[in-house]
Structures are given as C-alpha cells and as structure tokens.
Amino acid sequence: MTAAHRNETVTRALTGVVFVAVVMGAVAWSAWSNALLWAVVAVLAWAEWFKAPEGPPTSWPKPLLFLFPVPALAALVWMGEADPYDPWPILSFLWMIWANDTGAYVVGKPFGKRKLWPAVSPGKSWEGTLGGVAAAAGVAWAALGSEWLWLGGVMGALSTAGDLTQSAWKRRRHMKDSGNLLPGHGGIMDRFDGFLFAAPVYAILWCIFAP
C-alpha cells in the first residue's frame, strides 16, 4: 500500500467515524436534534444539486430537484414526532441502510461477477446486492425482532434503488461524486442517496405494522 493510498484510507475511516457519530448522536439526542439534522441534510443536498453541471436537455430541471429529497427527509422528521420521543425506529433504519452498503461491498468486492446495471454503476453486482439485502435483513432481525426480517430486505432493495438513481443522475452530468464535503466519501448525497426511496416506505410500513 502506497503512502497516498494509506492516507486516503485513514481519511476515509476517520470521516466515516465522525459522520456516523454525528448522525446517530443527533437522532438519539432528541426530536429537535433529529429534525435539525434532516433539515441540514436537505439544505446541503440542495446546495450540491444546484451547484452540479447542467445535464442533457432531457434531464430533470434543477428546480424540480428541490422536491426530490423532501419525502425521505420529511419521513424521518415525522417519525421523530412520536410522544414520547423514541429514536430506536430511526436508528434501526439507519443501521439497515448502512448494513446494506457494507454487505454489498463485502460480498460484491470478492464475489461480484454479474453486473447489476453496468451503464450506470459498473461496480455494483447482483451478488453484492443480495449480500447487502441479506445484511439489512439481519440488522432488522437483530434490532427489531425476527418478525421484521422482511422489512430489512425491503429496505436493502430500496436503498440500492436510491443509490442507482443518484448514480444515473451523476453519470448524465459526468460527475464522480455529488460533492466533496465528506473527505474520502464525496458529497452529502453520496452518503444519503440510499434514503431517497427507503425512508418514505419505511415510515409508511412502520405506521402500518408497528405495535
């Protein structure tokens, strides 16, 4: 490993630790800090999108992108409005999404042979996707109970769909990352793209099936 690669790995790891600590801390602290967290994420996401290069004529106009993250972030704020405040459902959601990302990488890196959507995200494979879904299901089982195993699988699949949507948007604009706010990780939407479809569906399913 070269010195540059080592430094990049250390930077990525430190950024990841700080990122996870801040997000989990804000969610766990109170309903107000949870709402503030997602409001800040929304503002940063909008800033990244509006600073991005213009896409082809068939791309979505930038003003329309203003609405894109609203359902996901509003769902996480709404879930924090329970009285008394209970951060566990939101934390469980975060762990499922992160487990999906980790499982997809751990399985896809050595075993990924069949590409999921090479034109949009060449690094993603069917094997990695299944590994991510399995990891998310395992976290749902551990955090919420065996009866929620299916929910983890659904969140894993929807997280991947959000990731692919963001990748397609970046590719049409010839962008590698959505920004550079998080050293070693890219922009804010590179970390939260998995929430786009998963968070609203999670909130709806939780409302229907949670005791």
What is each PLM-predicted segment?
Residues 136-137, 194, 198, 207:
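Hydrophobic transmembrane alpha-helices of multi-pass small-molecule transporters
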Residues 203-211:
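Juxtamembrane boundary at the C-terminal end of a transmembrane helix
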Residues 172-195:
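Interfacial loop-to-transmembrane junctions
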